[in-house]
UniProtKB/Swiss-Prot annotation:
Sequence positions that bind ATP: G883, P884, P885, G886, T887, G888, K889, T890
Region (AAA-cassette D1): 576-785
Protein name: Peroxisomal ATPase PEX6
Reaction equations catalysed: ATP + H2O = ADP + phosphate + H(+)
Extent of Acidic residues compositional bias: 183-204, 1173-1183
Enzyme Commission number(s) of this protein: 3.6.4.-
Taxonomic path: Eukaryota, Fungi, Dikarya, Ascomycota, Pezizomycotina
Keyword Cytoplasm: yes
Domain of life from the UniProt record: Eukaryota
Gene Ontology process terms (BP): protein import into peroxisome matrix
Length: 1183
């Protein structure tokens, strides 16, 4: 029978949490019809062979919560056809459980290879069947995907593992009945865990370990049916106490919804999913209830909590369910979840966002017995009679109050808002209580596109009067509705309502008159879509749940749930997303919280105006303001200055001021203590009257935030309006790592196991948040192209097959990120000034071992141990290379940048000069600011003597060079003080005239590390340089570089040796070209040179080998760039800077004029200590 490969996945398909695929590929056959061997199989059914060997399907499905023990071992799956991928390599780990030396490794390798051949599809984690049971082997790694078929070209690698490693035999649990219970981890029974973590519980439940496949099917989705706690309201409770138990739990809001199909008993489709709480199965007995029972939930705020007028704690009913096994995790992780109750963030917010809550079984508790200072005291109540309703009463009429936000007050979104409100209550029977917050999701882009004035207002006149802004559409603008709850893509946003009043039905009113009170259900009522009347009666000002401790944006899918790079120990739905928070974000959040707090308003504190500045665009200032306001729970109203600014004279300024005041009034209508006014591109307000308008707006609001990318263009009167200025600088390496992690998680990007985001962040120096988003998107594009190329190489394989197989090939890997970073640097280098890392290594530098050691001492220590300089300790960040020209000072600086993965800035003297007063010094400041933004970075000043000569000796009338030197000295001092933000910037200067430099540059803390780069004084050093220069040449076998170096004089610099090698290669090329020309002339049929090289040339004709004669001829024509007299002069200069005159003493006092100045200049670096100069004077040549 033909074999067909299919991919299976549990239904519903679980969300991926790593690069592993939720699908598993298996081979299948379709049995013939009307065969006695194969009975009739129902449709949509797959039969799996029952054998003692572990089937990969069991392992793949063992951790999935959708397995159901219904009519045997049957469970819902999804199936799709696929083509298996041919594996390039398979790594198998093994160890022997028998005596050592029983089998040699070659025999074991043969057995494992034979076992792999018998497997039709190999999966990562599969157990390989071998002939002897004393040898256990498991597939550890498959490439390029996690599952595929073995071919003749597949490379099998067998590795012996230590028996003590847990990844050996009991990696995922013991083998029971020939089946490996991967992921069911019953190495520690529930009894052991409960005895460790739940000693304070009186009724611990003994959950037996799983030992058979039937147990897998019966325990993964629900609590074990073998326990005394069987699920369902009708279960027996003969062994339980009649008094309801009251337990205190830590409240945890969910970041993702738990699917209803995973709960047992399965709730009705019409039940409100927001009125459910989830606990571990063993904690249900502590409550004395079963999964699916009604319980009472109340906040535990102590004396300051939300209480009723009679002093009792406000509470509400909810249904309690046990966490599915997928969410509960392994037993050792469950200890971390002890005493936690999980609930919807909306329910958590309606309870008052408490840190802890109390739960009790009885929903008919008497609130008067819930006194201050006590938890919910157990109340002995009679069993409810048949007349007592088992669900909360149905509301006859519910009045909703609209929370005034920029979204809910936007005219263009009113039709979508009403439609979303209707959809919210029609999906299920919602349970509401007076004061509850209700979110309504709408598509902002779609709502604006479908906006029609004819369908603008609801039919009732009251609502029409409450919608403000019935004026010019410009008052609202295209971005006026952008507020809290808008996701990054601008698709979904949330508008909020609050429940005002609830009118009970006639039946509920009669029940209350017969002795029941409305508080028997905590004041909660059910909204029946068919009978309850919904009324929107006005609006109110208020806040929404802060996202700092409530993941409601993820829960409502406004922001996509993050995919962690590594599977966390606790399911992501049970944890708050760990987003990166920058120091500026934290500071801005504190300012917003302080300005909008009730205490500051009561004390009459002045409002705050914050100006966010940056030197680069797309750095994330506006997004920073949105997230800071979202953390506090206030709304944000955005105004783009370029949208309202007019063109023309004074009349346009008047219109701009009017539009600004009108929009600020709309922001104030949402509540000055509940709304933040955000103005972007504040530099566009250049008119004088705008400063007065901004001052009035700030006085009417509690906090105003403005952004600009060029603070120098902001008029001084406008800038004086702001009380705080926060600079959003380019992110450093740690901040870029956090941003990359957050970007990849929010976009649901799966990363390969080899990816280290800190390494990627190191290569993205000088890139800001917007650029990092582009890098991730480019990497995603590169990943798609790579998978398309991989699929094209394999016959019949598509990209979809690779994605189903999973593994690193279907995820973003190092290759994708490298291509994305390279492309981003090439495209953004000119626009944002991102410096490039030169591709020069130490292999390009000949010798200089002592110079390399000195450089590593200066640069490597601050990079690897920054904590040594964190408290203000000065570091040595300045290096000065001096010596004859052509010794490779520039090349050495580039090699330093490459060796330490530093960015490289090369500054030339004319770049800093400007004809306007003050601009030259500003250019120096900009250079160092760009370096700080791109740190770790090297700033290289070539020909430093032309940039910073001695002050007072220049003839320019304005003293430009003197001011440049002074500014350079100030920046160098800032680099060495060890202040925050100054680390990671190293300054390197190069000059062949150090005697012309300003003496102040050579003092400690500036260029205090002076290294002399001279010519090679031995033939061995010349040989080292020649080997570095010719490492990419094709040298003739008879050529000896050592022989060539012995003929060279000691006056050749590195540049001279480079010219020698280049001329030798040129002569070799000329010689080979002459031979080819002669060969063409000797041919019978004359052909062109191009035709010869295209069709007739042999490898020997195009091969160019440099011979000794080529070097000798090049040497005859080479003239050294530095004479012997010049070298002697540089030696004297070196001695002047690196030696101490023993005879120097009182005679120095008698020196005057130039002699005295030279002595002062020499004394400067001389006092820097012996470590400031070369150690033994044995300098090597360089290139």
């Amino acid at each position: 029978m033909p074999i067909t490969h299919v991919a299976l996945s549990p239904s519903p398909i679980p969300a991926p949490t790593s690069c592993a695929s939720p699908w598993i590929v298996i081979p299948t056959t379709i049995p013939p019809l009307n065969s006695s061997q194969f009975p009739t199989i129902p449709l949509s059914t797959i039969l799996l062979p029952a054998s003692g060997a572990p089937h990969p399907l069991w392992e793949a499905f063992a951790n999935q919560p959708s397995l159901r023990a219904e009519n045997g071992i049957k469970f819902p799956i999804q199936l799709t056809a696929t083509t298996p991928i041919a594996l390039t390599s398979v790594v198998v780990g093994f160890f022997s459980t028998g005596e050592e030396g029983l089998f040699d490794e070659e025999t074991i390798e043969e057995m494992i290879t034979k076992g792999l051949d018998d497997m039709r599809v190999v999966h990562t984690g599969d157990i390989v069947r071998v002939q002897w049971m004393s040898v256990l082997a498991r597939v550890r790694l498959c490439e390029p995907v996690d599952q595929g078929v073995i071919t003749e070209d597949t490379k099998v690698i067998v590795v012996k593992e230590s028996r003590g490693k847990k990844t050996g035999e009991p990696e995922d649990g013991p083998l029971a009945n020939g089946i490996d219970l991967n992921g069911v981890d019953d190495s520690d029974s529930d009894e052991d865990v409960l005895s460790q973590g739940d000693d304070d519980d009186e009724n611990n439940v003994d959950l037996p370990g799983v030992s058979t496949f039937m147990d897998i099917a019966t325990t993964l989705g629900t609590p074990s049916i073998s326990t005394p706690l069987r699920n369902g309201p009708g279960a027996s409770i003969s062994g339980l106490s009649d008094a309801p138990k009251v337990v205190k739990f830590t409240a945890k809001p969910l970041s993702q919804k738990i699917p209803t199909t995973l709960l047992l008993p399965t709730p009705p489709a019409a039940d409100d999913a927001e009125a459910r709480v989830y606990v571990r199965v063993n904690e249900l007995m502590g409550l004395g209830c079963f999964s699916g029972d009604w319980i009472g939930v109340a906040s535990d705020h102590g004396l300051f909590g939300d209480r009723l007028p009679n002093g009792s704690r406000a509470w509400r009913p909810a249904k309690v369910y046990s966490l599915p096994e997928l969410y509960a995790g392994k037993e050792k992780v469950k200890v971390l979840m002890k005493g936690c109750v999980y609930m919807s963030p909306l329910l958590h917010a309606n309870l008052g966002s408490p840190s802890s809550v109390v739960l009790t079984k009885s929903p008919f508790m008497n609130p008067s017995n819930i006194q201050q200072g006590a938890l919910l005291s157990p109340v002995t109540t009679a069993p409810p009679s048949s007349a007592t309703p088992q669900i909360p009463p149905t509301a006859k009429e519910v009045t909703l109050l609209r929370i005034s936000t920029p979204i809910s007050t936007d005219r263009a979104l009113q039709p979508s808002l009403l439609a979303g409100l209707k959809t919210y209550f029609e999906t299920s029977r919602k349970m509401v209580k007076v004061g509850d917050l209700i979110p309504v999701l709408i598509d902002e882009s779609l709502g604006r596109n479908l906006f029609s004035p004819a369908a603008l207002l609801p039919p009732d006149a009251e609502n029409a009067e409450e919608i403000p802004g019935a004026g010019d559409e410009l008052l609202y603008g295209s971005h006026g509705g952008a507020g809290i709850g808008v996701n990054n893509t601008g698709k979904l946003c949330a508008a909020w309502f609050r429940v005002g009043t609830i009118a009970p039905t006639d039946e509920a009113t009669n029940a209350f008159s017969n002795g029941m009170t409305s508080q028997q259900w905590g004041g909660v009522a059910i909204v029946d879509p068919g009978s309850t009347r919904m009324v929107q009666a006005g609006s109110e000002r208020g806040r929404i749940p802060p996202t700092l401790n409530s993941p409601w944006e993820y829960y409502l899918n406004i922001v996509p749930p993050p995919i962690p790079n590594n599977p966390p120990p606790i399911h992501p739905a049970l944890e708050l997303p760990n987003n990166y928070i920058s120091p500026v974000h934290r500071r801005l959040r504190e300012l917003i919280s302080a300005a909008t707090s009730l205490r500051s308003i009561k004390l009459g504190l002045a409002p705050l105006a914050v100006l966010l500045t940056s030197t680069q665009r797309s750095i994330g200032k506006r997004l920073l303001a949105y997230r800071a306001a979202s953390d506090v729970g206030v709304h944000i109203f955005h105004i783009d200055a370029y949208d309202i600014i007019g063109e023309g004279g004074q009349a346009s300024d008047v219109k701009t001021e009017a539009y600004l005041r009108a929009r600020s009034e709309r922001a104030a209508s949402c509540g000055i203590e509940n709304c933040v006014l955000l103005i972007s591109h504040i530099e566009a307000f250049t008119a004088e009257r705008m400063a007065e308008a901004l001052r009035d707006i700030v006085a009417d609001m509690r906090i105003v935030i403005a952004t600009t990318t060029d603070v120098d263009k902001v008029p001084e009167p406008v800038r004086n309006v702001f009380t705080h200025e926060l600079e959003v600088g380019a992110p450093d390496e740690g901040e870029r790592t956090g941003l990359l992690r957050q970007i990849t998680q929010e976009r649901g990007v799966r990363l390969a196991k080899e990816i280290d985001l800190s390494t990627i962040a190191l290569k993205t120096a000088a890139l800001v948040a917007g650029d990092l988003v582009d890098v991730v998107e480019r990497a995603m594009t590169a990943c798609s192209e790579r998978m398309e190329g991989l699929a094209a190489e394999m016959e019949g394989v598509t990209v979809r097959d690779i994605q189903l197989a999973g593994g690193d090939a279907s995820c973003l890997n190092k290759q994708d990120f490298e291509a994305a970073v390279d492309a981003a640097r090439k495209n953004f280098a000119d626009s944002i000034g991102a410096p490039k890392i030169p591709n020069v290594s130490w292999d390009d530098v000949g010798g200089l071992a002592n110079v390399k050691s000195a450089v590593m001492e200066t640069i490597q220590l601050p990079l690897e141990r920054p904590e040594l300089f964190a408290k203000g300790m000065k570091k040595r960040s300045g290096i000065l290379f001096y010596g004859p020209p052509g010794t490779g000072k520039t090349l050495l600086a580039k090699a330093i940048a490459t060796e330490f993965s530093l960015n490289f800035f090369s500054v030339k003297g004319p770049e800093l000069l400007n004809m306007y007063i003050g601009e030259s010094e500003a250019n120096v400041r900009r250079v160092f600011q760009r370096a700080r933004d791109a740190r770790p970075c090297v700033v290289f000043f070539d020909e430093l003597d032309s940039v910073a000569p001695k002050r007072g000796n220049q003839g320019d009338s304005g003293g430009v060079m003197d001011r440049i030197v002074s500014q350079l000295l100030a920046e160098l001092d800032g680099m060495s003080e060890g202040k925050e933000g100054s680390g990671g910037v190293f300054v390197i200067g190069a000059t062949n005239r150090p005697d012309l430099l300003d003496p102040a540059l050579l003092r400690p803390g500036r260029f205090d590390k002076m290294l002399f780069l001279g010519v090679s004084d031995t033939h061995h050093k010349q040989l080292t340089i020649l080997e570095a220069l010719t490492r990419k040449f094709t040298l003739h076998n008879s050529l000896s570089l050592a022989k060539i170096s012995e003929t060279l004089p000691f006056t050749y610099t590195g540049a001279d040796l480079y010219a020698l090698c280049s001329d030798a290669m040129l002569k070799a090329i000329t010689r080979q070209a002459s031979k080819v020309d002669q060969k063409i002339k000797e041919m019978e049929n004359p052909v062109s040179t191009a035709y010869f090289f295209d069709y007739l040339a042999t490898p020997d004709d195009v091969a160019v080998a440099v011979t000794e004669d080529d070097f000798m001829e090049a040497k005859k024509e080479l003239i050294g760039s530095v004479s012997q007299k010049e070298l002697e002069h540089y030696d004297r200069v070196r001695q002047m800077f690196e030696t101490v005159d023993e005879k120097k003493g009182d005679a120095t006092v008698d020196k005057k004029g130039k002699g005295r100045a030279i002595e002062i200049m020499v004394d400067g670096p001389g006092t820097g200590g012996e470590g400031a100069f070369g150690d033994d004077g044995d300098e090597e040549g360089l290139y």
